[in-house]
Amino acid sequence: MPFLRVDAYEGRSKEQVKNLLDAIHRAVLSAFGVPPRDRYQVYQAHADSNFIVQDTGLNIKRTRNVVFIAITSRQRTEQQKTNLYSRLVEELKACGIEQNDIVVSLVTNSDADWSFGNARAQFLTGEL
């Protein structure tokens, strides 16, 4: 049940944002094997003055198409994680986003760290 936050420069149309989020969802489905209805995504567009993208010494050139994808998820294997990075590149290429403009942060947690409402930890109670 991954939770995704996507941050990017402002300027994308509603259709472009929908296509972007759909592409990311397909990558997560493929790499993590989660059910299609497990979709929790937040998209935030930022003005130039509120978005700083610097080189970290890897000599990766960024453009205004850069997207930051922060994923909070239950523990995944290294293979699942590297598959996700590859699938994101494949899926986002159709949205005009090149691999140099995809930044991913994956944070894992445990079953006790999730509540989907009603003050319950559904992974612990067996509801999920």
For the regions a protein language model found, what residue spans apply to each?
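Interaction-mediating elements
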Residues: M1-L128
